[in-house]
């Protein structure tokens, strides 16, 4: 019998990044604009430059990976660094940068897992009446961009199309705190997710028809939804509706190739409450179905869960982007209210810490979508206000958070779920889309004034796990 504290041979112990959150150089070296550029400048709260200065410092970070036993790294390609206008003219400096980055990774034995679009779709697709992926021509543009990358960067063997489609929809059309955002537009949220899933499916088919070596999948932020009172039918319905928004819509599209009848019914109901309709076409379903055999892997980003209770009233959502504990609110018409179950801890940003939820989620994927092939935990970590004292960062709560989640991953593996790797979010401290720089996730502390890196206690702990393949209690 396998030791329950032993990870399988070949398990990937990685660290995760994203282009806009680490690279810096957002308007240099030929890079085109993305919506976040003007949006953040108008806010004036924080800037994505220089972030972690990964554009210039990536050799330092890859060396840290090598020294600390990290054998995989999630990176993303900035679409507008390759195609500054989204389509058309190619920026050779951007192409050269990513070749150099991938070569450095591969030569160090730190295998790159590459995402094509991590929240930074080019601004060009929002001009002249465009609405990003709500405009269907963007689907075709993405597929052409993906095909270029597959053919150009053949040194990459692990591809993901998108990062966190539900989060993109939530920020854009539910919470509305992203560029070009609107609040409580569930109709647009579902439509955006659908169109992006069609783009994913077409890119997956293109990858396999092109005969490229390697694997391809998608990364989703999946979040277990629980009724606050499990024996209350109304609370159970609230949890079900929230699950459709965050999980079932994208999982059905990926692994069914269509939307189950009750999934579509729930989405249509929520779209009608928001005053809109969904445009799901026969050719869209054909595209989803065509990709079914070719979804090689699923990336699961997991941080928290949600407890829901039934409630009547108007929409009221407040995003906690400051770390002022207790300031978040989540009430969505047609769904219900987000609550905290007694005895369950939360972070300063009101994220519920419930590691057992990851086990429930993984078993649910295995049971409900048995045609899945493999899962990577592509993000998991804890945002924390790290204290920097004499060059040492004692982030014991982060270690405990990671240990608990890894233990539940091992239990899921023992239960028959095929999990092939874990990528901690994040490799180094990074720029956060809605929190700036005070919410730190990294294994390596960055002094953003000097860009010097300092390993945290969690980095040494993770090094031991990665190098031994053992999770110690």
Language model features by range: what are they?
Residues 23-98:
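Active-site-adjacent substrate/metal-binding segments within catalytic domains
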Residues 2-42, 85-87, 95-473:
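Active-site region of glycoside hydrolase catalytic domains
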């Amino acid at each position: 019998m396998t030791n329950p504290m032993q990870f399988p041979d070949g398990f990937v112990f990685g660290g995760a990044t994203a282009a806009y959150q680490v690279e810096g150089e957002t308007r240099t070296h030929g890079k085109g604009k993305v919506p976040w550029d003007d949006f953040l400048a108008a806010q004036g709260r924080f800037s994505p430059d220089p972030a972690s200065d990964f554009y210039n410092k990536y050799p330092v970070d890859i060396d840290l990976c090598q020294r600390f036993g990290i054998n995989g790294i999630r990176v993303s390609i900035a679409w507008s660094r390759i195609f500054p206008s989204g389509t058309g003219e190619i920026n050779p400096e951007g192409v050269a940068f990513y070749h150099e980055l991938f070569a450095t990774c591969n030569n160090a034995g730190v295998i790159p897992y590459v995402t094509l679009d991590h929240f930074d779709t080019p601004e060009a697709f929002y001009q002249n009446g465009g609405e990003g992926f709500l405009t269907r021509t963007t689907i075709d543009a993405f597929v052409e961009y993906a095909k270029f990358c597959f053919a150009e960067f053949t040194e990459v063997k692990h591809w993901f199309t998108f990062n966190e489609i539900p989060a993109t929809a939530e920020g854009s059309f539910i919470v509305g705190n992203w560029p070009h955002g609107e609040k409580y537009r569930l109709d647009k949220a579902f439509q955006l997710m659908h169109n992006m899933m069609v783009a994913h499916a077409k890119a997956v088919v293109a990858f396999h028809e092109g005969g490229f070596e390697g694997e391809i999948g998608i990364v989703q932020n999946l979040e277990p939804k629980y009724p606050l009172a499990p024996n209350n039918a109304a609370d159970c319905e609230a949890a079900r509706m929230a699950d459709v928004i965050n999980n079932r819509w994208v999982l059905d599209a990926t692994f069914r190739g269509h939307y189950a009848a009750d999934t579509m019914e729930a989405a249509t109901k929520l779209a009608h409450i928001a005053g809109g309709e969904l445009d799901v076409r026969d050719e869209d379903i054909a595209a989803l179905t065509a990709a079914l055999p070719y979804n090689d892997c699923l990336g699961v980003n997991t941080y928290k869960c949600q407890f829901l209770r039934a409630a009547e009233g108007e929409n009221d959502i407040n995003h906690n982007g400051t770390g002022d504990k207790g300031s978040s609110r989540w009430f969505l018409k047609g769904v219900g209210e987000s609550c905290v179950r007694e005895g369950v801890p939360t972070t300063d940003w009101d994220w519920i810490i419930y590691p057992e939820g990851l086990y429930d989620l993984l078993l649910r994927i295995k049971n409900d979508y048995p045609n899945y092939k493999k899962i990577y935990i592509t993000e998991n970590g804890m945002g924390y206000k790290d204290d920097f004292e004499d060059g040492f960062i004692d982030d014991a709560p982060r270690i405990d958070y990671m240990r608990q989640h890894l233990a539940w991953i091992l239990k899921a593996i023992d239960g028959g779920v095929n999990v092939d790797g874990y990528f901690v979010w994040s490799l180094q401290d990074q720029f956060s889309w809605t929190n700036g720089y005070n919410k730190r996730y990294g294994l390596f502390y960055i002094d953003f004034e000097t860009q010097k890196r300092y390993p945290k206690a969690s980095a040494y702990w993770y090094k031991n796990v990665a190098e031994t393949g053992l999770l110690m209690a």
